Amino acid sequence: MLSKLASLQTIAALRRGVHTSVASATSVATKKTEQGPPSSEYIFERESKYGAHNYHPLPVALERGKGIYMWDVEGRQYFDFLSAYGAVSQGHCHPKIIDAMKSQVDKLTLTSRAFYNNVLGEYEEYITKLFNYNKVLPMNTGVEAGETACKLARRWGYTVKGIQKYKAKIVFADGNFWGRTLSAISSSTDPTSYDGFGPFMPGFETIPYNDLPALERALQDPNVAAFMVEPIQGEAGVIVPDPGYLTGVRELCTRHQVLFIADEIQTGLARTGRWLAVDHENVRPDMVLLGKALSGGLYPVSAVLCDDEIMLTIKPGEHGSTYGGNPLGCRIAIAALEVLEEENLAENADKMGAILRKELMKLPSDVVTSVRGKGLLNAIVIRETKDCDAWKVCLRLRDNGLLAKPTHGDIIRLAPPLVIKEDEIRESVEIINKTILSF
């Protein structure tokens, strides 16, 4: 009875957040009828009834996307300023990536790694040469890449650095986010992620982000095998470290024989105006994690890049994935990377991001207290009042034709697809400005 009441309360809350036009058009449509396709309200109610309540989506029911735009089931068009957390950097349904997927799906989709396939090696050669690493280990999701990096770091710590077996430590930064598996939440400092899910993975330690003295103290422990860090913290609210931080990380890790692992799942692949966010300081990590835009949003593909000294510490049978390195995912990833190259999307992200931040800085400071970011990974901080907070701003942005999502309470991440043009940036800023001025 209590769970039913909670479900009804959730549905009621969703209804209150929907477009007034949606609510009026569908107020009596609590189930699909023969008169037409499902309404937004029907879709909200069905998900609430049959799906786990582990997400709190913005109430909009989308059915298609193209480039920088998405459309809901009622046909309303929106600017996409989330890009599926950066996964659709190449734009929704990019024709080259779609064509690559179609061409492969009729030939061969999955073999497992029990056999060779004719696409994996092509992908491996391409991505390792592109990023100048000896080897790549293909996986599917971003969190799998993180898990893989942790295993590689521990094995390297034992076989190369000489750490006593099962004593290896990995250091992370406060505010990190790389997924919601038990390993990932074991490094988290966000109670929403970890509270109630212990016991946690041993051998994980955290230090303040953007704090080189704290890192130096931590690395003096001879049992530390690696420091894993986001060049810009995405989920924490697009936290950009001080200039020189990544250079300092590289120097300290080298000095203390500790692996520098760059989590570029969200920041990499042109998002910040460079191929990798670490490229802003011209540093080379020992390991790089890639995902999200590695498939252009069509298919889960992730990767760990490193050199032989690290990668070859793992032998056959010691790590793998049924789907990792499958021919369909590899063909899609090749096309997704080619789009980034051929369309100069890192350069476009750099230019469009500068324009976006310049315009966002003009927003009234009594509502928007801060603007930060690099390339097209940006955020605004909302001054919370009784009548205004980040969630309410996002609801009103939706009503005005732009989709964004709060992160960490008062922060709104603004990360459109990298194919966005200047006139589209300026039109989007007009929507943001109109929305902010309405509070």
Swiss-Prot record:
Superkingdom of origin organism:
Eukaryota
N6-(pyridoxal phosphate)lysine: which positions carry it? 292
Q: Where in the cell is it found?
A: Mitochondrion matrix
Stretch forming the transit peptide: 1-25
Per its UniProt record, what CDD domains does this chain match?
A: OAT_like (cd00610)
Q: Which GO terms describe its biological process?
A: L-proline biosynthetic process
One matching Pfam family is Aminotran_3
Q: Which GO terms describe its molecular function?
A: identical protein binding; ornithine aminotransferase activity; pyridoxal phosphate binding
The record ties this protein, via SUPFAM superfamilies, to: PLP-dependent transferases
User: Which UniProt key words apply to this protein?
Assistant: Acetylation, Aminotransferase, Mitochondrion, Pyridoxal phosphate, Transferase, Transit peptide
What S-S linkages are listed for this chain?
A: none
Which residues get modified to N6-succinyllysine? 102, 107, 362, 405
Known catalytic reactions: L-ornithine + 2-oxoglutarate = L-glutamate 5-semialdehyde + L-glutamate
User: What family is this?
Assistant: Belongs to the class-III pyridoxal-phosphate-dependent aminotransferase family.
Concerning NCBIfam families, the annotation shows: Orn_aminotrans (TIGR01885)
- Give the protein's recorded name: Ornithine aminotransferase, mitochondrial
What organism is listed for this UniProt entry?
A: Mus musculus (Mouse)
Tell me the gene name.
Oat
